[in-house]
Amino acid sequence: MTSPPMLDIRNLNVALLNGRPILRDVSLTVAPGEVRALVGESGAGKSMIGKAVLGILPRGLKVTSGEILLEGQPLHDLRLAARRRRVAEIAALIPQDPLTALNPVRRIGAQIVDPLVKIHGWTRTAAQARALDLLHRVHIRAPERVMQSYPHELSGGMRQRVLIASAFAASPRLIVADEPTTALDVTVQKQILRLIRELQQETGTAVLFVTHDMGVVAKISQQVSVLFQGKVMEDAPTEAVFDAPDHAYTQALIAATPSYADPARPFSPVPQSLIAEMSAALAMEVRR
């Protein structure tokens, strides 16, 4: 018998309280052990998909229709407390900005250990050992010292490594990585991407990876969903998307990405005429 997808999103619609659509009939799956990228420009709705899965949509947004299933179980069938427990058991988040994600007045060790103890029922001794092990595995030198440090005492790359360690600490089966390299310089970004990929392959964790960078998509994912104004424009294996992109918007995103392998290759921004045409088509859908 075939096992269900780790994550299965079916015709998900999210809107503002005034009815303005944010996500439009989004459907996608993430298989166990798979990395799926969500890519698009700012405002495409990429992060909102991850937040809807985790049940942390911002105030003023609501799911109006559709289903989200984790390991085949519909989350909408569960009461709020049971849903939170289910999500916490299966999924974890790597946020975009480590400086705001980490509590500035608590030591790093406590921020990794306490969730393991309070949410997942670990003993404090086991949780501390797990935290030290993960800090070591994300290539942090002197993890014992870092456990006693505060966030402001670490560099941006070190803080992001801490968040990765924290996300993997409870052995989640799904990780939502919400633009985890956006705030980092290119050199550190490359290290963090390699680190996430290493841990993902080692643990077999499924990853929903949010990014605006097609270069990152090529490096880390097997599947990709291209979004524009909350709608999936193209959904295909990553290799196929780069070899023969089907949608004009996907073609434009690739053309707008600098090539480090071929610096002489020209690139250009996404044409405003294409954006206007796609926006008008989506507006017509809303009117219908």
Predicted regions and their residues:
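ABC ATPase "signature
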Residues: 232-236
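Conserved ABC ATPase "signature" region
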Residues: 74, 126-145, 255
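A short, proline-enriched helix->beta-strand linker immediately N-terminal to the Walker B motif
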Residues: 169-173
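ABC ATPase NBD coupling module
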Residues: 62, 75-92, 110, 118, ...
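Short catalytic/signature loops enriched in Gly
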Residues: 5, 141-144, 237-288
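A short, surface-exposed alpha-helical micro-motif characterized by mixed small hydrophobic
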Residues: 217-219
